[in-house]
């Protein structure tokens, strides 16, 4: 690419990054540890309601997993609820519903920072550390309490190790494991419960969350995991006294696909239950009184009393008689006032003073009879503070917008002045204008897939009407597009039970036949011209199929007999040595072998091309790249690459016959449309809840590497977009008379204009109700598309391949 285009691209990326740095700043927080404010001497002399705290965090424990009939298998918890020794709540978790910001909320009571959702996956990030921020953890440590911690090592990223007298962290992102990751926590229990040399015991279990990511909320592995966690709760309950409070909670919930990060009811409704033998001596919460557990299904997962998750913080602080953390937005849970007796009013007034100080409001003297109005006012202040929790850096916002405005103007000038006025350029300008204007509506952002669907239908319909000679190809393309449309659920507002992907899950024989057919068709593409390379591709395809079958077996999916036989024979040849390996042991070596074989084939083909330059270099490598993308794709989506192959063939025929003078220009524009359409129809959305981690660990052992996992995650989630981007550059090499930089101007124009308009929309909507659940994730996706597709794929990888091709 020419220096001018590269310079514009770097300036565009820099402008968006500057804007993001101003839009997602670290929040300003009150430093230091809190002290009692109201009747301080009296409070310091009070006895706590409990002596010890056991906190069991079950990652992604949705409220229905804990309370709902036919869903929950926490039988012992239900028994305790019915005896009054457990009080249940549905705790609302503010989005983004990922672990790191939710743990911040649970421990400090503060509102989440959306940047934490991004930092959540950065293993070596230290910017989220809470060493200098007040929390009930730091308060317990300051008061000389001994804290033992076992589980998700996110806690060790948040808090200094000196806060914990004993700790053992487990990696939270190796989602392929949902057994050992919990066993490593539970193995500490016998010793901890026997010696009880702690005041606070924190256990954070990850297995349930991993099961959700792997198989969804209704996975066959969910009931056994519920029972396992229920047994842990029973084990703790049986060995602690009535002066110990056991709290079981989810840090967030999950949607039906098993993902989280967004703002749907399932993701924000976490279960929470307080357990103690002492509780049966006090009146139950009104919502629980006379109700038998497990309960029937509730609308939007609202079971028993609904509280804010941050309300846990002042409640725990009050029950254990420590100051409420300075930055807490929580409001004391009124149901626990009976445990504090005559001092309940003192604690509520203390909470009132703390919250008003955080809101910078003056507090007037209050009488004991004003408790109800005080709690109501606190709830109002809580809601206001939660909405205005972020301090935007306006200098960086406007610098980013100003810089991007200049870049966009320059890019638009270069594109419009160099482009011929034809159907391809008009279509690109129309698509850019339509998408750019749509970002100002939250519903358009949530349902963006609808826009791309109607764009492709309109374009193909227009082409069919004006070029009827290509009727068969148009018809085939439309049939494939409709099949693509119905393959998965897309968007965030509506879910459908009968999708092609769900049907394939329930008919595994058909699914695996289609997987075989897809790999065979892709691998043997061009067999008559390059039989040797096709055989190598077939070897890579075979390794991919064997790995996918093993993965399915390990994760409880059904695979047909012929697939099992193939796996057995292939593995006996590949891993001979006398020691039989089970499918789980084979996963990592199989994936690594696949990537090594693929890399060897690519290197061999590049070396061959250096000696014998061939114009079809990229088209010969394209099937192998497609197999790599298939490797990073969920099995039910793999047949879509067969659909893509048919669509690509039809599209090339339409352009060859109907658009001979603008073939490559039109393919570039249609490639951009199909990148976005196929991304959404693969199940993607503009919510971080649909980021799929399933294939992020192919070939990764327990030695978690953020960079490798991040790369695999990006390839897996952007596989369809990468496919269509590479398809466009293959056609460019074969047929284009223009330079790649000239062709690339069209996509640069699209990305620049849409980036600018989204940044403007984010400024306009910064106090909108959906700023964190809709516009902020969209901004994150904009960064992802710009970096992964626009920069790494189209500006780094594709020009490199064209250079090698000569």
Curated annotation (Swiss-Prot):
Gene3D superfamilies per record: Alkaline Phosphatase, subunit A
A UniProt-annotated Pfam family: PIGO_PIGG
Single annotated GO MF: CP2 mannose-ethanolamine phosphotransferase activity
Residue positions the entry lists as glycosylated: 70, 184, 242, 488
Annotated transmembrane regions: 396-416, 425-445, 451-471, 508-528, 532-552, 593-613, 624-644, 664-684, 706-726, 745-765, 782-804
Principal location listed in the UniProt entry: endoplasmic reticulum
Pathway, per record: Glycolipid biosynthesis; glycosylphosphatidylinositol-anchor biosynthesis
EC number: 2.-.-.-
GO BP annotations, alphabetical order: GPI anchor biosynthetic process
Keywords from the named record: Endoplasmic reticulum, Glycoprotein, GPI-anchor biosynthesis, Membrane, Transferase, Transmembrane, Transmembrane helix
Membrane topology qualifier: Multi-pass membrane protein
Signal peptide: none
Cellular compartment(s): Endoplasmic reticulum membrane
InterPro entries reported for this sequence: Alkaline_phosphatase_core_sf (IPR017850), Phosphodiest/P_Trfase (IPR002591), PIG-G_N (IPR037674), PIGG/GPI7 (IPR039527), PIGG/GPI7_C (IPR045687)
GO CC aspect terms: endoplasmic reticulum membrane; plasma membrane
Entry-linked PANTHER family: GPI ETHANOLAMINE PHOSPHATE TRANSFERASE 2, PHOSPHATIDYLINOSITOL GLYCAN-RELATED
Function description: Ethanolamine phosphate transferase involved in glycosylphosphatidylinositol-anchor biosynthesis. Transfers ethanolamine phosphate to the GPI second mannose.
Family statement drawn from the similarity comment of this UniProt entry: Belongs to the PIGG/PIGN/PIGO family. PIGG subfamily.
Protein name: GPI ethanolamine phosphate transferase 2
Species name: Eremothecium gossypii (strain ATCC 10895 / CBS 109.51 / FGSC 9923 / NRRL Y-1056)
């Amino acid at each position: 690419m020419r220096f001018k285009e590269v310079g514009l691209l770097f300036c565009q990326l820099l402008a968006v990054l500057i804007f993001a740095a101003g839009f997602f700043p670290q929040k300003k927080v009150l430093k230091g540890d809190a002290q009692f404010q109201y009747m301080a001497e009296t409070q310091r002399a009070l006895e706590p309601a409990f002596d010890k705290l056991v906190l069991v965090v079950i990652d992604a424990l949705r409220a229905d997993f804990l309370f709902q009939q036919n869903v929950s298998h926490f039988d012992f918890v239900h028994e305790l609820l019915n005896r009054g020794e457990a009080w249940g709540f549905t705790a609302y978790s503010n989005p983004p519903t990922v672990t790191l910001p939710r743990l911040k909320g649970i421990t400090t009571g503060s509102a989440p920072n959306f940047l934490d959702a991004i930092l959540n996956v950065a293993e070596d990030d230290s910017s989220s550390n809470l060493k200098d921020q007040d929390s009930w953890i730091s308060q317990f440590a300051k008061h000389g309490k001994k804290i033992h911690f076992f589980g998700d090592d996110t806690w060790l990223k948040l808090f200094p190790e000196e806060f914990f007298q004993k700790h053992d962290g487990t990696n939270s992102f190796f989602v392929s494991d949902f057994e050992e990751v919990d066993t490593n926590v539970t193995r500490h229990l016998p010793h901890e419960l026997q010696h009880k040399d702690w005041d606070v015991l924190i256990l954070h279990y990850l297995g349930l969350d991993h099961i959700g990511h792997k198989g969804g909320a209704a996975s066959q592995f969910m009931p056994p995991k519920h029972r396992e966690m229920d047994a842990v709760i029973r084990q703790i309950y049986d060995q602690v006294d009535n002066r110990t409070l056991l709290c079981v909670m989810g840090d967030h919930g999950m949607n039906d696909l098993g993902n989280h990060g967004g703002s749907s009811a399932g993701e924000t409704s976490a279960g929470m239950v307080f357990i103690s033998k002492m509780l049966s001596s006090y009146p139950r919460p009104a919502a629980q009184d006379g109700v038998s557990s497990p309960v029937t299904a509730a609308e939007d997962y609202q079971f028993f009393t609904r509280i804010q998750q941050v309300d846990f913080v002042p409640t725990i602080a009050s029950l254990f008689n420590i100051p409420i953390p300075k930055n807490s937005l929580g409001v004391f849970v009124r149901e626990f006032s009976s445990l504090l007796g005559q001092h309940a009013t003192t604690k509520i007034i203390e909470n009132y003073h703390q919250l008003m100080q955080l809101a910078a409001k003056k507090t007037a003297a209050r009488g004991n009879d004003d408790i109800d109005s005080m709690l109501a006012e606190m709830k109002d202040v809580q809601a206001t503070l939660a909405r205005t929790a972020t301090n935007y850096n306006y200098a960086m916002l406007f610098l980013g917008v100003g810089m991007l405005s200049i870049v966009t103007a320059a890019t638009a000038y270069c594109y419009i002045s160099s482009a011929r006025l034809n159907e391809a350029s008009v279509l690109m300008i129309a698509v850019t204008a339509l998408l750019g204007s749509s970002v100002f509506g939250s519903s358009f952002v949530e349902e963006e897939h609808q826009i791309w669907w109607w764009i492709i239908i309109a374009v193909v319909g227009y082409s069919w009407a004006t070029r009827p000679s290509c009727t068969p190809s148009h018809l085939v393309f439309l049939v494939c597009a409709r099949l693509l449309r119905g393959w998965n659920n897309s968007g965030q507002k509506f879910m459908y039970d009968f999708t092609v992907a769900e049907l394939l899950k329930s008919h595994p024989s058909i699914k695996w036949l289609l997987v075989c057919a897809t790999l065979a068709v892709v691998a043997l593409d061009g067999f008559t011209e390059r039989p040797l390379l096709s055989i190598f591709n077939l070897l890579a395809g075979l390794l991919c199929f064997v790995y996918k079958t093993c993965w399915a077996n390990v994760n409880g999916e059904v695979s047909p007999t012929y697939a099992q036989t193939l796996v057995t024979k292939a593995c006996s040849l590949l891993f001979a040595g006398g020691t039989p390996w089970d499918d789980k042991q084979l996963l990592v070596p199989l994936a690594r072998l696949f990537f090594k074989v693929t890399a060897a084939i690519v290197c061999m083909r590049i070396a061959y091309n250096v000696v014998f330059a061939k114009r079809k270099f990229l088209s010969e490598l394209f099937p192998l790249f497609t197999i790599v993308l298939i490797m990073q794709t969920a099995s039910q989506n793999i047949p879509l690459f067969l659909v893509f192959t048919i669509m690509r063939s039809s599209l090339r025929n339409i352009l060859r016959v109907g658009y001979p003078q603008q073939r490559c220009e039109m393919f570039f524009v249609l490639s951009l449309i199909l990148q976005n359409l196929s991304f959404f129809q693969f199940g993607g959305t503009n919510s971080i809840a649909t980021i799929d981690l399933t294939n992020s660990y192919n070939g990764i052992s327990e030695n978690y590497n953020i960079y490798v996992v991040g790369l695999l995650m990006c390839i897996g989630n952007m596989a369809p977009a990468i496919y269509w981007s590479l398809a466009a550059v293959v056609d460019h090499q074969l047929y284009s008379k223009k330079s790649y930089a000239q062709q690339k101007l069209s996509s640069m124009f699209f990305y620049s204009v849409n980036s600018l308009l989204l940044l403007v929309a984010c400024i306009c909507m910064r106090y909108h109700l959906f700023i964190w659940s809709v516009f902020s994730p969209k901004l994150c996706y904009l960064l992802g598309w710009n970096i992964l597709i626009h920069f790494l794929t189209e500006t780094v990888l594709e020009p490199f391949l064209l250079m090698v091709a000569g």
